[in-house]
């Protein structure tokens, strides 16, 4: 799955995350958010109740744009904010949890210091600060959350690197993909087939489990893409980050074989790669367990499931540009990137 995200032809979503939709209580009828919050008087209302009210009112909104955010973002942001206020008491030493409307710079500084002690990854800290900016925007306080260096964070602690610096593929770590998949197949054929989809189509871990091999691979004519961009007779699609449809040409014999194998294992035309008797969460855990069972972990082998997608994208880069990707010793050439 390698072409850019596209808007045409929006097929049915592979699924939603439960537990992140809120129904407006009848008591809120004909009331504005400001009126609802005014009934929760600072100093008297339970701070966590105020937080839940804010989440119900605003959590579906994007921080900076006039649009809604994905169900995944809603879930992760709500979970973080609840944990943040609990951690102010449990980790930062505050005797009482503050009302979200009274959150001050000292509260932000205290939790940044907790994150520093815990040595959280730069990407994690950036995400946490982004979630706090969202809370500030709900409260009408744009600019309340300042730049990371204001809180004493060094660039190494908050600057995330969008481009990979190392080759994270299985082959780069001495693993024979076919040999590993043969062993996994004997244990769990579905898990192995999902891994093969990651390897050949460049799917992410979750995408490989949610992939519906009969529905998600279609003739080019059904993609809605311009004829000038046609690279194969069939294309696969997934719902990428942000809910956008991502199309990718199924151009090689290996890709077609992976799709046919997947189709042979599922139970129906609309079936996904996971075991139908298990939830999405349990199917993802089963995939992780299969990897762990054969030593495919960061700790044991230096790689994760994502290494299959990483290898696919590096191979694609080389096939399109004619040169190895930068992480494989090639030059970081802008003209090659455009290939």
Give residue ranges: language-model regions:
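Basic/aromatic DNA-contact patch characteristic of tyrosine site-specific recombinases
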Residues: 1-75, 79-82
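N-terminal core-binding DNA-recognition domain of tyrosine recombinases/integrases
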Residues: 58-164
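DNA breakage-rejoining catalytic core of tyrosine-based enzymes
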Residues: 158-179, 242-254
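Short, cationic motifs built from Arg/Lys/His that form the positively charged side of catalytic pockets
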Residues: 190-191, 203-204, 246, 260-263, ...
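C-terminal catalytic core of tyrosine-transesterase DNA break-rejoin enzymes
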Residues: 196, 307-339
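Active-site/catalytic core of tyrosine-dependent DNA strand-transfer enzymes
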Residues: 250-321
């Amino acid at each position: 799955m390698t072409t850019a995200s596209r808007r045409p032809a929006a097929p049915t979503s592979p699924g939603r995350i439960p537990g992140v939709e809120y129904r407006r209580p009848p008591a809120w009828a004909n009331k504005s958010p400001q009126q609802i919050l005014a009934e929760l008087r600072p100093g008297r209302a339970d701070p966590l109740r105020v937080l839940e009210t804010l989440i119900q009112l605003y959590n579906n909104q994007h921080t900076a744009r006039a649009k809604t955010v994905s169900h995944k973002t809603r879930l992760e942001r709500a979970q973080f904010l609840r944990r943040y206020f609990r951690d102010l008491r449990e980790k930062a030493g505050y005797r009482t949890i503050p009302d979200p409307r009274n959150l001050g710079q000292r509260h932000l500084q205290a939790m940044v210091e907790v994150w520093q002690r815990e040595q959280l990854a730069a990407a994690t800290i950036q995400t946490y600060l982004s979630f706090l900016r969202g809370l500030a925007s709900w409260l009408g306080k744009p600019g309340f959350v300042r730049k990371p260096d204001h809180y004493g964070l060094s660039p190494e602690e908050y600057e995330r690197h969008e481009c990979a610096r190392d080759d994270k593929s299985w082959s780069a770590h001495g693993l024979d993909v076919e040999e590993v998949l043969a062993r996994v197949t004997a244990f769990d054929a579905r898990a192995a087939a999902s891994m093969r989809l990651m390897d050949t189509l460049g799917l992410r871990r979750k995408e490989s489990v949610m992939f519906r091999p009969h529905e998600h691979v279609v003739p080019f004519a059904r993609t809605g893409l311009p004829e000038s961009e046609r690279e194969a007779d069939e294309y696969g699609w997934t719902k990428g980050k942000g809910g956008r449809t991502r199309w990718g040409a199924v151009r090689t014999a290996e890709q077609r074989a992976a799709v046919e194998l997947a189709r042979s294992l599922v139970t129906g035309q609309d079936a996904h790669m996971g075991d139908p008797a298990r939830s999405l969460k349990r199917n993802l855990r089963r995939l992780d367990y299969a990897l762990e069972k054969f030593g495919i972990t960061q700790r044991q082998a230096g790689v994760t499931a994502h290494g299959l997608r990483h290898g696919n994208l590096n191979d694609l880069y080389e096939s399109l540009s004619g040169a190895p990707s930068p992480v494989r010793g090639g030059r970081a050439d802008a003209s090659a990137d455009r290939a």
